[in-house]
Amino acid sequence: MIVFICKFLHLISLFIAGGGGIGNAVIQSIYKKEGKIPEPHLAKSFRVLAFISLIAVIVMWVTGIILAILIYGGFNLSWSFHVKLLGATLILITSLLINVHLKKCSQNQIPPNQTLMKYSASLARLGLILAIAGAIWTFV
């Protein structure tokens, strides 16, 4: 039963993290193309989505570790599994970085650094590609 619950939470977290990340990226790109700064209430929603996504990524890590131990007896699966872990690590690091940056910007009432946000998004996309490719190679 614990395996089922962990798989369920793992997949739900995947959808939540992905939805938050894509939603934020789409809305921010529209504002950027129009040369506008988001209103304060919308900027707050960016922070909330980023935080929810971070929590979802952390849940994926915890449930993934539990699943690897329960199903496979540990992390010694294959090189492709470690590529997946590298991708997941990049996603976790960028999510933490973005959340810390948005929190500081909110406290100081300044707009987010667009260069940092751009490179963080690119790093997260790379992590996503590695995580998906590694998961497909390992588990399919």
Model-derived regions, located:
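Polytopic transmembrane helical bundles with strong interfacial aromatic enrichment
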Residues: 1-140
